[in-house]
């Protein structure tokens, strides 16, 4: 049966899509690179314009190539564990505040494998922090090794939709995302129960209308 079209696929839906794979199975693959990325998030009581709840801070970043993605990078699993490699990448991209943040196997959420344009497994982690920790990461990110080079800056994901029904998350999803980071973001919204499925579908439809 042919798959139905979905608004979040965009123009690239005809390209081979990554498939889900278990962490254990992925580590048995030969000839594949491994990349680990993490969503750092924290609850927030703030309100935009004193009326629109922020609810939760989710961090993404603007990359050197002009695309949005999550912090992290490639890990050589021959030398270190996925989590050790991710920790190193986070410190390089986000700075000294990450020295006290431990990302463990308990924070692991999913893995996907793709064959094109290169054989690669992407591993996704979700780590909850305190708002004060997120704010410290944001403040100290300018001192990171990769700031201004591989990382152009940190970005908070707007979880709300404004009265015009396109401002906020629908407009945010119109950005250019690297690899499967957009699907990882949508996965996180579902996994953390930040939006109901009907709300996610409405956001995707609004975002699709903005693009087309």
Swiss-Prot record:
| UniProt keyword Cytoplasm, yes or no | yes
Q: Does the keyword Metal-binding apply?
A: yes
> In which tissues is this gene expressed?
Detected in ovary, and at very low levels in epithelial cells (at protein level).
The observed outcome of changing residue 92 to Q is:
Reduced activity; no effect on RNA-binding
Cite the binding residues for Mn(2+) 2. Answer: 89
**Cell location:** Nucleus; Nucleus, Nucleolus; Nucleus, Nucleoplasm; Cytoplasm
- All copies of the Nudix hydrolase domain together span 39-187
Q: List the EC numbers from the record.
A: 3.6.1.62, 3.6.1.64
Please describe what this protein does: RNA-binding and decapping enzyme that catalyzes the cleavage of the cap structure of snoRNAs and mRNAs in a metal-dependent manner. Part of the U8 snoRNP complex that is required for the accumulation of mature 5.8S and 28S rRNA. Has diphosphatase activity and removes m7G and/or m227G caps from U8 snoRNA and leaves a 5'monophosphate on the RNA. Also catalyzes the cleavage of the cap structure on mRNAs. Does not hydrolyze cap analog structures like 7-methylguanosine nucleoside triphosphate (m7GpppG). Also hydrolysis m7G- and m227G U3-capped RNAs but with less efficiencies.
Q: Which family does it belong to?
A: Belongs to the Nudix hydrolase family. NUDT16 subfamily.
Q: What is this protein called?
A: U8 snoRNA-decapping enzyme
Species for this entry: Xenopus laevis
